[in-house]
Amino acid sequence: MFPLGLSMLWESVEPEAALEQRFGFNSFGAATHWVSAVLEQTWGLTVLECLRMAISDQNAIVWVASDRGGLVVKCSRATERFAYLEASARLLSALAGQGVPVPSPITSLNGLDRETLEGRSCAVSFTVLPELAGDWLDVQDHAAVRSAGACLAEIHRALGATHVDGSVFASRSTGLKERIGGWLENFDRGFAPEASSRLAEFLARAPQLGDQTQLIHNDFRAANILTRNSRITGVLDFDDVVIDHRVSDLAKACVYLGTMFTDWRPTPIAVRQSLRAGYESVRPLSRSESEWFEILELWHGLMAIPDENDTAGWASAL
């Protein structure tokens, strides 16, 4: 859990300075006083205490004790993403209605899942979520990892059956072979040349992927997964949903599953295998998907290498 009061989610900057520069408040107390007023006036909720606030880029998350129990208030000043965030909130509500373990937005007095309000220095998009019980996924708990894999497959099923306006969600405009080939040609920084050569060889003989694109989570990892007794109690952060292939989402999840906010290291192979096994217990991959999984896992792994000073060992994990 994050510390009480004000903190940064992952950036190495002073939180007080970030709060004032990004949201216009000169103290944690001033910011939480405003959040409390917003919840009362726009949601009809009584705030008992604002416990903590974490800032991440143009966003802030506030944990609140209220007359409706524990709440998580998500705020964003990224105006270019407001339409996307509104669609993401509607998507959360739809998924919760299908029994997916996600926090369903609490509707405002206007009947909306997300509201845009004028803040101290900028417009702010708000959504209010119930706080889900559980601890972040421990990737050393292989039973929990298998449960996470099964949960991802169920999320894919639910996303595929959810009827929402997908026009605001980014869609990959080119096929996987063209996309990866373009990356190898134009964006590969050469940090793991042997792995890059292997990827090019795999790509040259890759089969046609017999699978349609759909909405996928796109950020399925330990920091966004809550567990209790090796079972999944919540999946968080649908703010990066895109339209792409399900097997790409699974491969990316295998690569990044063990990452947390400031603890960014590769996922051990045994953990990746457990996640995939859990996924396939619900939705087995087709033959072409299995071949593409190996390609995509290698590609996502290559893209994860931060720079030449790869102290976490991303390159050696390939």
Task: Label each region the model flagged.
Residues 1-109, 228-231:
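Conserved NTP-binding catalytic cores of kinases and kinase-like/nucleotidyltransferase enzymes
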Residues 9-15, 127, 167-207:
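Active-site catalytic-loop/activation-segment of kinase and kinase-like phosphoryl-transfer enzymes
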Residues 138-191, 213:
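A cross-family kinase active-site recognition segment
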Residues 111, 122-139, 181-184, 299-314:
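A glycine-centered beta->alpha junction motif in the catalytic cores
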Residues 247-284, 297-313:
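Active-site activation/catalytic loop segments of kinase-like enzymes and analogous catalytic loops
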Residues 66-164:
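ATP-binding pocket architecture of kinase catalytic cores
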Residues 57-68, 72-73, 105, 203-248:
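Active-site acidic catalytic loop and adjacent metal/ATP-binding pocket
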